[in-house]
Amino acid sequence: MAYVTMKGMLETGVHFGHQTRRWNPKMGTYIFGARNGIHIIDLQQTVKLFRTAHDKVVDTVARGGKVIFIGTKRQAQEAVQTEAGRAGQYYVTNRWMGGTLTNFQTIRKSIDRLKKLEVMFEDGTVNRYQKKEVLRLRREMDKLNLVLGGIKDMENLPQLAFIIDPNREDIAVKECRRLGIPIVAVTDTNCDPDLIDYVIPGNDDAIRAIKLFVGHIADACLEGEAMRKETKAENAEEAMKQAAEAEAEAAAPAAEESAE
């Protein structure tokens, strides 16, 4: 189990919220107190709520679902891209394009264009064009890859979203809620927890805190994937066993007739 620990959260500053004047009163239940004008998050609740969120991620992936990691703020970009990639999940780190989920069929056209350009550069087709046109196509490909690179293999909508800073990713939150996609989010003291299905109260600005959460959620995805493969193997083995038994039962009458 890849649960976060109290020690790990204290070391990475997960307990530091925003200035008290910038708080969202709805987060009051997750706040331990204040120190020097900064809200302090109740890490005992964070430990408990992270376990719930972690288990949701494991269950989702174990059932064959996919998770989309969303973190476009500078502090989150590297961790989100690295860890989501390690876990084989989707991610968005540059800019959330409106309609990424709610208008996915249109977004797919841009993804198809990106894949077509990548093939052109890989197989040398692009060399048929003049240098100026090649440069234009390269810029187009790089621009599309920057925004869509993390979801270019997404054939269907994800079954779960993991978000760093739901305030910043408000459009993504709205799209998920509209489509009924559950949201797991690192939710700081200035956020609205009512919009989140699985709240993880914590610092969503400190790089080390973000890395801690993103890494553990990626581990949860890998744990779920291992469970999925194990279940698949067990089901295949059981199917083969049942087929062998059925074949033996079918052959039994013929064997009896032959003996007679």
From Swiss-Prot:
List, in alphabetical order, the GO biological process terms annotated in this UniProt record: translation
Q: Which domain of life is it from?
A: Bacteria
Give the start-end ranges of region Disordered.
228-260
Where is composition skewed (Low complexity) in this entry?
A: 241-260
A GO molecular function annotation here is:
structural constituent of ribosome
Q: Which UniProt keywords apply?
A: Ribonucleoprotein, Ribosomal protein
Q: Name one GO cellular component term.
A: cytosolic small ribosomal subunit
Cystine pairs? none
What Pfam families does its record include? Ribosomal_S2
Give the matching Gene3D superfamilies.
Glucose-6-phosphate isomerase like protein, domain 1, Helix hairpin bin
Q: Where is the composition biased (Basic and acidic residues)?
A: 228-240
HAMAP family membership: Ribosomal_uS2_B
Similarity-based family? Belongs to the universal ribosomal protein uS2 family.
Task: Return the protein name.
Answer: Small ribosomal subunit protein uS2
Q: Which organism is it from?
A: Oleidesulfovibrio alaskensis (strain ATCC BAA-1058 / DSM 17464 / G20) (Desulfovibrio alaskensis)
- Provide the gene name from the record: rpsB
